């Protein structure tokens, strides 16, 4: 306790004599008659010597504002030292020449006895919600949207949850959900009351059914708490679905800001996913948004779905990019065929798509550089050429390079470097694990599996085939090697960034070609 002694002087309305109750630190107490002119109660704390910090006016005000900002009874705070200084300055002020007393400014309570969450949603305007948000959380930015909860019996709790605005992906997404008991602050971010994955939100919850002094063990084993938590999840999902269905334009405008939150929540709680799955959007390269179902319907309508196996539903491939600039060539090829490309450029996206695939067997995700031939190949026979295989293995410096031959619909592209979807996901997972554990990134146990895809419909590949054919001119071999090296380097450049040595060799090879023109 902060006080050695506590005095309570009280007088009832009935006019009976006042009573003074004095309690000591050892638990003993005394009762005395007292003098008090009006009815009411005074509580006087005699602060202990080692707790004198609680005599500081600013500390007391901070404590009152933290715990009692919304108490239903008005609280007035007076700093007697500050008031005395103010009166002394006022008496000496030159402005009081006639000696008359100025009207004393009416005192204002430090608390709001009618907080916004106690009102009906129909009584609150958007400006009310925004003002309350700025007041409580000291954020100068307006929230994206909010959820006003007014649960009746048997849950009997109220609150407002806000989706905060984030300016960039590196900004902290840790939220703040304040728990109140009959408008008295209890604690922040109690994960037993609100699921951990919802703690990225900001808001207030007033649960009068909870005891003021809550303990973790009590909350973990309390049926009421689990029902409150489930109801909050339901209200959040209902809000997402409502915005997606009835206010789609606004929902799409805020999707990029809430995308990480929704994906993380879906991964943490299958029930959340089941309720909110229809509100999950895919951002496309043209800036538009579609649901997974809408993407699937268009792919089926356009004939971009492989025939289904007997007795099974067709599997729709959702093609995506992780870097619109680096993978621009692949994007152009797909868009030329009318295939939509989703943008999944966040760290959490890799884990999220794996979760979606595990929940829905009719959908799979594939980056556009994994196996583009499946979507871009043309009809017709393809003839493999082992001489070209050896030529490109030599050009790449990798005698185990896998080389495939396909006839693509776009004849202008001679070759593409593809990377296995599974090996790339494994590498990304290892990088993410190293970031989470704070450890040093290790060399991958399974290196990325690259495949060079040669487009047999390309005139350049046809020319290269002729240069390595039997009966070609004597200088054809040197030209073939020069062309193969340049095709390989351009394929690498379209797939990833060059290393320092690769860049040096690319520049040297390009200059060599120019000198021979």
Q: At which residue positions do the language-model features occur?
A:
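Conserved GHKL (Bergerat-fold) ATPase module
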Residues: 6-517
């Amino acid at each position: 306790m902060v006080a050695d002694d506590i005095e309570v002087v009280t007088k009832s309305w009935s006019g009976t004599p006042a009573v003074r109750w004095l309690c000591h630190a050892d638990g003993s107490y005394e009762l005395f008659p007292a003098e008090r002119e009006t009815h009411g109660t005074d509580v006087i704390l005699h602060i202990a010597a080692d707790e004198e910090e609680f005599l500081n006016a600013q500390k007391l005000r901070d404590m009152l504002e933290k715990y009692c900002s919304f108490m239903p009874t008005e609280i007035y705070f007076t700093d007697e030292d500050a008031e005395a200084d103010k009166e002394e300055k006022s008496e000496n002020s030159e402005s009081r020449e006639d000696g008359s007393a100025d009207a004393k400014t009416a005192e204002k309570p430090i608390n709001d006895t009618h907080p916004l969450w106690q009102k009906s949603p129909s009584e609150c305007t958007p400006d009310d919600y925004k003002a309350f948000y700025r007041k409580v959380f000291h954020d100068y930015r307006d929230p994206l949207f909010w959820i006003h909860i007014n649960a009746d019996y048997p849950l009997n709790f109220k609150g407002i949850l806000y989706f905060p605005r984030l300016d960039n992906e590196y900004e902290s997404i840790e939220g703040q959900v304040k728990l109140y008991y009959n408008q008295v602050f209890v604690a922040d971010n109690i994960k037993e009351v609100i699921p951990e994955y919802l703690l990225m939100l900001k808001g207030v919850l007033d649960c009068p059914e909870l005891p003021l002094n809550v303990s973790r063990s009590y909350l973990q084993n309390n049926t009421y708490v689990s029902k409150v938590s489930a109801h909050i999840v339901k209200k959040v999902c209902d809000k997402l679905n409502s915005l997606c269905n009835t206010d789609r334009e606004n929902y799409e405008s805020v999707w990029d800001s809430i995308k990480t939150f929704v994906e993380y929540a879906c991964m943490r709680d299958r029930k959340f996913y089941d309720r909110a799955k229809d509100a999950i959007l895919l951002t496309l390269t043209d800036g538009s948004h579609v649901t997974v179902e809408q993407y699937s319907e268009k792919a089926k309508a356009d004939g971009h779905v492989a025939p289904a196996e007997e007795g099974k539903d067709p599997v729709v491939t959702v093609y995506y990019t992780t870097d619109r600039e680096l993978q621009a060539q692949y994007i152009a090829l797909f868009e030329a065929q009318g295939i939509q490309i989703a943008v999944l450029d966040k760290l959490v996206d890799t884990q999220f798509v794996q979760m979606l695939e595990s929940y829905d067997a009719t959908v799979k995700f594939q980056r556009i550089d994994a196996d583009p031939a499946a979507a871009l190949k043309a009809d017709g026979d393809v003839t493999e050429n082992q001489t070209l295989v050896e030529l490109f293995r030599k050009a790449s410096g990798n005698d185990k390079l896998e080389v495939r031959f396909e006839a693509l619909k776009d004849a202008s592209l001679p070759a593409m470097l593809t990377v296995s979807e599974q090996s790339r996901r494994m590498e990304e997972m290892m990088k993410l694990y190293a970031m989470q554990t704070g450890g040093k990134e290790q060399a991958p146990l399974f290196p990325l599996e690259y495949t060079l895809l040669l487009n047999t419909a390309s005139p350049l590949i046809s020319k290269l085939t002729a240069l390595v054919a039997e009966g070609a001119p004597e200088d054809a071999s040197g030209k073939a090697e020069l062309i193969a090296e340049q095709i390989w380097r351009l394929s690498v450049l379209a797939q990833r960034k060059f290393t320092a040595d690769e860049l040096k060799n690319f520049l040297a090879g390009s200059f060599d070609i120019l000198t021979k023109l």
